[in-house]
Amino acid sequence: MAVPARHTSKAKKNKRRTHYKLTAPSVKFDETTGDYSRSHRVSLKGYYKGRKIAKANAAE
């Protein structure tokens, strides 16, 4: 049966877990709409790469 030969110390465990972290989403300023939006995604107003490709939400 597979059992660890030694107890994993808190330091060893925490050093391994230092790589588990959140990264901030990439955000860019869209000059067409004047809003900030995430890269490689359609903005809330329906623009992608400066071109209108989708209808905006009806709530606006």
UniProtKB/Swiss-Prot annotation:
Keywords: Ribonucleoprotein, Ribosomal protein
One annotated Gene Ontology cellular component of this protein: large ribosomal subunit
GO function terms (MF aspect): structural constituent of ribosome
Keyword RNA-binding among UniProt keywords: no
GO BP term, pick one: translation
UniProt key word Aminoacyl-tRNA synthetase: no
InterPro entries hit by this protein: Ribosomal_bL32, Ribosomal_bL32_bact, Ribosomal_zn-bd
Domain of life from the UniProt record: Bacteria
PANTHER family given in the database record: 50S RIBOSOMAL PROTEIN L32, LARGE RIBOSOMAL SUBUNIT PROTEIN BL32
HAMAP family, per database record: Ribosomal_bL32
Family membership noted in the UniProt record: Belongs to the bacterial ribosomal protein bL32 family.
Protein name per the record: Large ribosomal subunit protein bL32
Organism: Streptococcus equi subsp. zooepidemicus (strain MGCS10565)
